From Swiss-Prot:
<dbReference type="Pfam" id="PF01975">
    <property type="entry name" value="SurE"/>
</dbReference>
<protein>
    <recommendedName>
        <fullName>5'-nucleotidase SurE</fullName>
        <ecNumber>3.1.3.5</ecNumber>
    </recommendedName>
</protein>
<feature type="binding site">
    <location>
        <position position="45"/>
    </location>
    <ligand>
        <name>a divalent metal cation</name>
    </ligand>
</feature>
<keyword id="KW-0963">Cytoplasm</keyword>
<dbReference type="GO" id="GO:0000166">
    <property type="term" value="F:nucleotide binding"/>
</dbReference>
<feature type="binding site">
    <location>
        <position position="15"/>
    </location>
    <ligand>
        <name>a divalent metal cation</name>
    </ligand>
</feature>
<dbReference type="GO" id="GO:0046872">
    <property type="term" value="F:metal ion binding"/>
</dbReference>
<feature type="binding site">
    <location>
        <position position="14"/>
    </location>
    <ligand>
        <name>a divalent metal cation</name>
    </ligand>
</feature>
<keyword id="KW-0547">Nucleotide-binding</keyword>
<dbReference type="GO" id="GO:0008253">
    <property type="term" value="F:5'-nucleotidase activity"/>
</dbReference>
<keyword id="KW-0378">Hydrolase</keyword>
<comment type="function">
    <text>Nucleotidase that shows phosphatase activity on nucleoside 5'-monophosphates.</text>
</comment>
<dbReference type="InterPro" id="IPR002828">
    <property type="entry name" value="SurE-like_Pase/nucleotidase"/>
</dbReference>
<keyword id="KW-0479">Metal-binding</keyword>
<dbReference type="InterPro" id="IPR036523">
    <property type="entry name" value="SurE-like_sf"/>
</dbReference>
<dbReference type="GO" id="GO:0005737">
    <property type="term" value="C:cytoplasm"/>
</dbReference>
<dbReference type="InterPro" id="IPR030048">
    <property type="entry name" value="SurE"/>
</dbReference>
Length: 267
């Protein structure tokens, strides 16, 4: 009999290698294969799919709650690239990015979230990818030390991700799906309903706050209130209005699904 192949799973995040969310992500797939952690050494939220091309990168061996891990001095995308081409030296069977402390919903986050950015990088190699995020009720928690976030908040999410990851490893991704974006509501339990959703347009009402330093010179904070009401069927509605788990299938191909002759009028 041939030797049974053990799936290789790469885990990353954007909150940094020491986040409790990363350990929860590891726990969610630890029984599914050989798991390797390659994640940013420090907080990298909001960097999207950015890549480091103007400076060298370093890898430091460390541990996450007793689990061996690699801390990368770069972005989540850098962590995936080094994880695949330097640490594993092979394509994994699955990449899991998360758990992010804070929901990643709407088109706002698809291009800005480092959690999703790392998953998109993996998907670009044809590797099935999952991004997993936990809703927070206090927006300030997104900016607190991710090492201090309560581990028990991830229990329901761990079960959801385990089930989905198991099926992805078994069946592969559906046709034309490159990434599954999973968001877990704050009060999720084992029997919380799961919705397959589409992306809402926005999650933030973008605003800019101007302040003055002690010398009277202006500086600025990008800010904005959360949008909590969106159309039925969107990820924002599922999380914010219903308290349901949201799973959004994402494709790398962002080409508008239109008749291309519509564009010829502009030529």
């Amino acid at each position: 009999m041939g030797k049974l192949m053990v799936p290789k799973i790469l885990v990353t995040n954007d909150d940094g290698v020491y986040s409790t969310g990363l350990k929860a992500a590891f726990d969610s797939v630890s029984d599914l294969g050989e798991v390797t952690i390659s994640a940013p050494a420090v907080q990298q939220s909001g960097v999207g799919r950015s890549i480091s091309i103007f400076e060298p990168l370093r890898i430091t061996k460390t541990d996450v709650g007793g689990i061996p891990a690699y801390a990368v001095g770069g972005t989540p995308t850098d962590s995936v690239i080094l994880g695949v081409f330097t640490i594993l030296k092979a394509m994994p069977d699955l990449v899991l990015s998360g758990f992010n402390i804070g929901e990643n919903i709407s088109t706002d986050t698809i291009t800005t979230s480092g959690t999703i950015g790392g998953a998109l990088e993996a998907a670009s190699y044809g590797v099935p990818a999952i991004a997993a995020s936990m809703q927070v009720l206090d927006e300030g928690q997104k900016f607190d030390d991710p090492r201090d976030y309560q581990r028990e908040r991830f229990e329901a999410g761990i079960k959801v991700v385990n089930r989905i990851a198991r099926n992805v490893l078994k069946r592969g991704m559906p046709e034309n799906v490159d990434l599954l974006n999973i968001n877990i509501p704050f009060h999720a339990e084992e029997d919380t309903p799961i919705e397959i959703t589409r992306l809402a347009r926005k999650i933030f009402k973008t605003d800019v706050e101007e302040r003055r330093d002690p010398r009277g010179r202006p500086y600025y904070w990008i800010a904005g209130d959360l949008i909590r009401e969106e159309e039925e069927g969107t990820d924002v509605h599922a999380i914010m209005q219903k308290g349901h788990v949201s799973i959004t299938p994402i494709s790398l191909d962002s080409t508008a699904r239109i008749d291309f002759s519509e564009i010829e009028r502009y030529l």
